[in-house]
Amino acid sequence: MKKQQICILGSTGSIGTQALDVIEQHPDRYEAYCLTANNRVDELAAQARKFNPAAVVIANEAHYDRLKQLLADMPDIKVYAGADALCQIVEAGPIDMVLTAMVGFSGLAPTIHAIKARKKICLANKETLVVAGELVCRLAAENRVPILPVDSEHSAIFQSIVGEGDNPIEKILLTASGGPFRKFTLDQMRDVTAADALKHPTWAMGAKITIDSASMMNKGFEVIEAKWLFGVPADKIQVLVHPQSIVHSAVQFCDGAVKAQLGVPDMRLPIQYAFSFPDRLPLNGDRLDLFKQPLEFFEPDLEKFRCLALAFESIKRGGNMPCIVNAANEVVNEGFRKGRCSFLGMGEIIEKTMAKATFSATPDYDTYIATDAEARRIAAELMALA
C-alpha cells in the first residue's frame, strides 16, 4: 500500500500534535510530507527530526535562520519561510491531503491554494468557512475536492449522514460543552479572567479556541461551518449545551429519526476518521463507559453568551458579516488574553464593529482580505477606547 503523504498546516498546535500521534500509530499508511508552524520554531525542528518530512515551513520569517540552524545536520529536509511559502508548499505534487490546523484567518489562503491543487482537505481551521464559506465550498465543488471535517462536532454530523444519500435533514443538533462559565450569572461573568476562561472542563485545546469556547463564539462559528459543510440553513441548526461532551452532535431526519455519534472527548478520533474515510482504523485510547455519568442537555442562554447570538445574527445578514465578526473576535480574543479587554467586553466590541465596518452583500476574495483588515482596525480602536 502506498503511504498517504500528509501536509500539516499548524503541526505544533493542539490538532497538529494529535495528528502526528495518529500518523505515528499508522506508519504503514501515513507519512508527514510537510510540517508548518507560525512561531514555535524549536517544536517544529523537534517534530522534523522525529518524522523526517520532505519540507518544513515557518510562517514567521524572523525564525527562518534559527530553523535552518536547528536542522543544519538534516540536509534532506527543505526549509522555507513566509506566508507565500505556505501557499506554495500545499501544491507540492506528492501531497495527497492537507490538514488545515492553523488558527484564524491566516488559514484561508493556503486552504484555497490546496483546493485549487486538488488536494483532499481535512479541515480543522473553522475560520476558513466562517470567513469565506461560499467561496471555499464553490471552489471545492469546481475542483471536485472533498472537504472532510476535523472538528469533533462536524465529524459527528458527517458520520451521522454517511449512508443517508439524499435523505432530507430536518435538523442538526450541534452540541456544546457550555465552557467553564455555564453556571455563572451575568454579574459573575463581568469579573472573570483569562486564567479562569482557559480552564476548559472537558477538552484540552489551544488558547484561542479555549477562550472562544468560554464565550461560545466557537459554537457560533461551528453553526456557520455546519451551514456550509452540510448545506443546511442556520434556522435548522440547534445548539444544545451538553456538559459531558459525550454526544458530539446529532442529525434529525425527515422521519423524526435521530442519529448521533458518541465517544470520549479525544480529537484524535475525528482527525483519524478524516484521514482514513471511508475506512475505520484501530486507535489506542480510552473507551466510552456510559455507566459513568448521566448525559444532560440544556438550552444556551443567549443573554449571557452574547457572542453566540452575534454569530447567528451574522449568518442572517450574510455577505461579509461573518468575516467582520471573525476579524473582530480575533482581536478581542487576543486582547482578553492579554488583559486589555473584559470577558463581556468582547461581545460589546464585536457588536460595535459589526455596525461600523463596511458591509458587502456579494464579497469576493479581495473583499474578504479588505474586510478582515478594516474590521481588525475598528475592533482594535474600540478596544483601546474601552
Which positions does each model-derived feature cover?
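Catalytic, metal-anchored helix/loop core of enzyme active sites in primary metabolism
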Residues: 1-386
